Regions:
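Ferredoxin-like alpha/beta domains used as RNA- or RNAP-binding modules
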Residues: 1-5, 12, 22-82
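Short, charged beta-turn/beta-strand-edge "cap" motif at the junction between a beta-strand
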Residues: 14-17
C-alpha cells in the first residue's frame, strides 16, 4: 500500500460523498480523514479505503491547523475539475 498520509482524497460514499478530505493517517484498510469544518483534526473520521478516491495532491500535515486545512481544501476544490 502506498503512503496516503497528507494526500487529498474525495469521498465516494457516506454523508460526505463528493467532498474533499485530507488523510491524516492510514492503516491497512482504513484512512483517518479531516476537512477542518465537519471533521476537525481533533476528531478524525475513519473511512474505508474503498470509500475514498485519492488525488495526486499531497500536503504537509506537520503544522496543520483546522483553519489552514479549510483554506487548502477550498483552494483545491476551486482549482480541480472533479
Amino acid at each position: 500500500m502506498e503512503s496516503l498520509s497528507g494526500r487529498i482524497v474525495r469521498s465516494c460514499a457516506g454523508r460526505d460523498k463528493g467532498n474533499f478530505l485530507v488523510v491524516i493517517r492510514a492503516d491497512e484498510s482504513f484512512v483517518y480523514v479531516a476537512d477542518g469544518k465537519e471533521r476537525k483534526l481533533a476528531s478524525l473520521k475513519k473511512k474505508s479505503l474503498k470509500h475514498v478516491k485519492p488525488t495526486n495532491t499531497v500536503i504537509d500535515t506537520e503544522s496543520l491547523t483546522d483553519k489552514k486545512l479549510r483554506k487548502l481544501i477550498a483552494e483545491f476544490s476551486a482549482a480541480s475539475d472533479f
